[in-house]
Curated annotation (Swiss-Prot):
Protein name (Swiss-Prot/TrEMBL): Gamma-glutamyl phosphate reductase
Pfam families: Aldedh
UniProt keyword terms in alphabetical order: Amino-acid biosynthesis, Cytoplasm, NADP, Oxidoreductase, Proline biosynthesis
Cellular compartment(s): Cytoplasm
EC number: 1.2.1.41
Pathway: Amino-acid biosynthesis; L-proline biosynthesis; L-glutamate 5-semialdehyde from L-glutamate: step 2/2
Domain of life: Bacteria
Gene: proA
Family (UniProt): Belongs to the gamma-glutamyl phosphate reductase family.
Reaction catalysed by this enzyme: L-glutamate 5-semialdehyde + phosphate + NADP(+) = L-glutamyl 5-phosphate + NADPH + H(+)
Function per UniProt: Catalyzes the NADPH-dependent reduction of L-glutamate 5-phosphate into L-glutamate 5-semialdehyde and phosphate. The product spontaneously undergoes cyclization to form 1-pyrroline-5-carboxylate.
Alphabetized InterPro entries for the sequence: Ald_DH/histidinol_DH, Ald_DH_C, Ald_DH_N, Aldehyde_DH_dom, G-glutamylP_reductase_CS, Glu-5-SA_DH, GPR_dom
């Protein structure tokens, strides 16, 4: 068979398997995930061996040290993968939950019940742990999943998937409910994106170029997990100690993640007093500042910012900064340059905080808290599939509930429509 024919078969088999997954009880799904977790631990030497092939190939390709680190699996990381599966076991099963019920004048009782999405396609890069994490969440929510990882992790991804599939086979669950596209060619992605007959939704996780490619080529609805151009706005009434603490945490705790701070906005009324302070603090932490003309009046050591800086997701110890006249300008800047990810305001003004919450057009908006809290675990969802910057079907960190949809259920006593 050609690549196109093989991928069509993978997708068709996943569709059939999704029907069986939707019928599984919570107990059966939890038992499967526990068995999968133990299987990962038991197969640690094999996973390390397969991962070494990816690392060797990556070194020959000249991948950066950071990329190789993202690829690497060792005993500790495999244990973390297994722990992640066990964590999903502890999450409430959303499937079958009735979220609302109401009575109609004709005595019909109408409700909404959570059901699986069906078949979820996930396209991702680099980190092989995503194979186990994504599979666990999709399966717990009663879905089948088709995974296409990056070519740089092909040996690791296939090895993880086969271990998990072995446990499905032992439990009598169709292995087609968890499939990995085993082709490194770009055709593997393009053909997967054509399977609208069998795959219900595509979730891409990776860099900007991957997201754009998927959006441009997919015939299937896409839930984008786009870049994080995250902002913090220091309002005129901000407590400076709080603002400094939040900015430092948002920018420096883990600068290479999507919920790290990338652009700092400062109200003009506090620019003269706050900018020298925050510039000195961040400079001591090796953060490069790129500011507009007004910012650099009070921080001469900052580099001039360009238009590109307002769009940038640095994922590094670099921070763009701008002075704004008022709340209107701060909100306008965020809604123009932001990526619908995460924004925060530091303020003592309740009215301003509420306006910021209402008018900023992003998936997570915080008042007096670090952008680093934009995370499924931190927000109480448990494990997440990613952070959606698409308003349909889900917006923000996606937990188990977001891998389901709802259907109407209706109870009658013989009613017919007049």
């Amino acid at each position: 068979m050609t690549i196109a024919e093989k991928i069509r078969k993978i997708a068709a088999d996943a569709r059939q398997a999704s029907l069986a997954m939707a019928r599984l009880s919570s107990a059966a799904k939890n038992e499967l995930l526990m068995n999968m977790a133990m299987a990962l631990i038991n197969n640690t030497p094999h996973l390390v061996e397969e991962n070494a092939k990816d690392l060797s190939a990556g070194e020959k390709k000249g991948l950066s040290a950071a990329m190789l680190d993202r690829l690497m699996l060792d005993e500790a990381r495999i244990k973390a993968m297994a722990d992640g599966l066990r964590e999903v076991v502890g999450l409430p099963d959303p499937v079958g939950e009735v979220t609302r019920m109401w009575k109609r004048p004709n005595e019909l009782t109408v409700g909404k019940m959570r059901i699986p999405l069906g078949v979820i396609g996930i396209i991702y890069e680099s980190r092989p742990n995503v194979t186990a994490d994504a599979a666990a969440l999709c399966l717990k929510a009663g879905n089948a999943v088709v995974l296409r990882g990056g070519s740089e992790a092909i040996y690791s991804n296939v090895a993880i998937a086969r271990i998990l599939q072995d446990e499905m086979r032992k439990d009598g669950i169709p292995v087609a409910a968890l499939s990995v596209i085993p082709f490194v060619e770009r055709e593997g992605v393009t053909e997967m994106l054509k399977q609208e007959e069998f795959i219900d939704v595509i979730i891409p996780r990776g860099g900007e170029s991957l997201i754009r490619f998927v959006v441009e080529h997919s015939k299937i609805p896409v839930i984008k997990h786009y870049k994080g151009v995250c902002h913090v706005f220091v309002d005129a009434s901000a407590d400076f100690d709080m603002a400094e603490r939040i900015i430092v945490n948002s920018k420096t705790q883990r600068p290479g993640v999507c919920n790290a701070l990338e652009t700092l906005l400062i109200h003009k009324d506090v620019a003269e007093t706050f900018i020298p302070r925050i510039f000195e603090t961040l400079a001591a932490l090796k953060v490069e500042m790129r500011g507009d003309d007004c910012f650099r009046q009070f921080a001469p050591g900052a580099t001039p910012a360009t238009e590109e800086d307002w769009h940038a997701e640095y994922l590094d110890l670099i921070l763009a900064a701008r002075v704004v006249d008022d709340m209107d300008e701060a909100i306008a800047h965020i809604n123009k340059y932001g990526s619908l990810h995460t924004e925060a305001i530091i303020t003592s003004d309740y009215g301003n905080s509420q306006r910021f919450l209402r008018e900023v057009n992003s998936s997570v908006v915080l008042v007096n808290a670090s952008t680093r809290f934009s995370d499924g675990n931190q927000l109480g969802l448990g494990a997440e599939i990613g952070i959606s910057t698409t308003k349909l079907h889900s917006f923000g960190p996606m937990g188990l509930e977001d891998l389901t949809t709802t259907k109407f259920i209706v109870y009658g006593e013989g009613q017919v429509r007049p």
